[in-house]
Amino acid sequence: MSFPYFISPEQAMRERSELARKGIARGRSVVALAYADGVLFVAENPSRSLQKVSELYDRVGFAAVGRFNEFNNLRSGGIRFADTQGYAYSRRDVTGRQLANVYAQTLGTIFTEQAKPYEVELCVAEVAHFGESKAPELYRITYDGSIADEPHFVVMGGATEPIIAKLNDSYTENAELADAVRIAVDALESGGNGAERRTLGPSTLEVAILDANRPRRAFRRITGSALEALLPQRDAEASADAGAADKPAE
């Protein structure tokens, strides 16, 4: 006589959590941090079409790691929810906290009720409306629906421990944009699995900001020459090193 296979609820939750954590850890890292004029998103992402960072609404941004199809569905659903709320009520009624709570409820339901949890981790950020003075809000939402507000920065995906340790040492409140980009990129470069420090350039970075000084839509991507201009020393050092390598020994 064969007995039906039984697994305790505790073991089932542990296995779901392990599956989700492993999937998230395989992804490349994303950093979101508050700076003087809003929120900066920096993602290690060589793809120009599969984006990890996007706008959700006028003053709200989104970043994610994990399975692209899963977090892209969540991103699209969040945009539809925000548009519906803004149309039915007021655009100012759509907040980052509201969207973070919706994502937390959705991921919590998926984690407990569906056969497989989503292998994703999300960040929802909001800046103050134009002319208002309010600190940026950063929310981290994990695969099981847990939600936490972070005062300064959020690190997701990949090897997060060295990146967090680097940011704990180097993060500065109210930094200018160029300084904030340097801090975030330096932290991402410390997150490799190997012993050697990696070098990340414009071709491997996805960078965007929520700029509180913009009148309505705060989200703006930084690409091409604008991104290169934020990393002048890095480019100059690379050119100097290349020139030294090409120069024959005397």
Swiss-Prot record:
SUPFAM superfamilies: N-terminal nucleophile aminohydrolases (Ntn hydrolases). Pathway: Protein degradation; proteasomal Pup-dependent pathway. It holds the Pfam family Proteasome. Its main location: cytoplasm. GO terms for cellular component: cytoplasm; proteasome core complex, alpha-subunit complex. The keyword Metal-binding does not apply. One of its GO terms (biological process) is proteasomal protein catabolic process. GO terms for molecular function: threonine-type endopeptidase activity. It is found in: Cytoplasm. Keywords: Cytoplasm, Proteasome. InterPro entries: Ntn_hydrolases_N, Proteasome_alpha, Proteasome_alpha-type, Proteasome_asu_bac, Proteasome_sua/b. The keyword tRNA processing does not apply. Disulfide bonds: none annotated. It comes from the Bacteria. The formation of the proteasomal ATPase ARC-20S proteasome complex, likely via the docking of the C-termini of ARC into the intersubunit pockets in the alpha-rings, may trigger opening of the gate for substrate entry. Interconversion between the open-gate and close-gate conformations leads to a dynamic regulation of the 20S proteasome proteolysis activity. PROSITE patterns: PROTEASOME_ALPHA_2. Component of the proteasome core, a large protease complex with broad specificity involved in protein degradation. Belongs to the peptidase T1A family. The 20S proteasome core is composed of 14 alpha and 14 beta subunits that assemble into four stacked heptameric rings, resulting in a barrel-shaped structure. The two inner rings, each composed of seven catalytic beta subunits, are sandwiched by two outer rings, each composed of seven alpha subunits. The catalytic chamber with the active sites is on the inside of the barrel. Has a gated structure, the ends of the cylinder being occluded by the N-termini of the alpha-subunits. Is capped by the proteasome-associated ATPase, ARC. NCBIfam families: 20S_bact_alpha. This is Proteasome subunit alpha.
